[in-house]
Amino acid sequence: MPSNPCRPGSDTTAAPAAVFPSAAPNWRRLDYLAQGNERQRSAHALLSGGLWDELGPLCNDLALVSTIAIGLDRPGSDLDILCQHPDPAFLAATLAAQGWQVRSKDEQVWIAEQRRHGPDGQCWPVELYLTPDPLEMCHGWRHLSLMAALLERFGAPFHREVLRLRFDEGLKGEAAMCRLLGLSGDPYEALLTLEGVNLAGLCCPSLPHPLDEQGHRPCPHPGGTLLP
């Protein structure tokens, strides 16, 4: 299969103790990790030190969609990688022959897992999602893009609260953000309701928000109300 044609660029956006691609995030990139926090730099060393080149010829497309990409990972977090291939079962068999632990998630998606040591000695659990779908359509890509946009929208206080919920209560990133935003139901589905929403007008009830001219905090998310 042809290798991933997308090569790293240079555009980065600062985030608390981390960096991630700015507007229209391209999760195929790795370069921004080298400029991030210690764990991001460690992940970059592993991925760019051979794993990306190892997987590239096997897949049509690759993207890192782990929370480490936006600085919301915890110790032990996986490096989640989307791998596009027209025949995921064939790719799974190829990876199994190379020592990966593989299993079927459904008829179209396979999972491959392995622990890898980077050049810095750090051991990372790596999880590959083998899919025939374009990567931008995958929930992992869509969730990460929304979470990055929300971090940019609400800044450091939001980032700190998400991390607090991740560490103190063990919540996934999606669940932590949905709690802070007051989104009910399945957090994986609830987060996707923000696709296409103008986040500039979105409020986070858990964070201070400037009052409008009527003394309310605007909360224009569909179904939301003006909060006194």
Label for each model-derived stretch:
Residues 136-228:
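Catalytic cores of NTP-dependent nucleotidyl/adenyl transfer enzymes across multiple folds
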Residues 93-94, 129, 139-142:
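A short secondary-structure junction signal
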Residues 2-64, 222-228:
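Helical scaffold of the NTase/Pol beta-like nucleotidyltransferase catalytic core
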Residues 89-91, 134-136:
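Residue-level signal for secondary-structure boundary sites
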Residues 91-99:
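Short amphipathic alpha-helices in soluble, non-transmembrane regions
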Residues 33, 68-77, 192, 201, ...:
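Long, low-complexity, intrinsically disordered polar/charged segments
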Residues 51-90:
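Active-site nucleotide-donor binding segment shared across nucleotidyl transfer reactions
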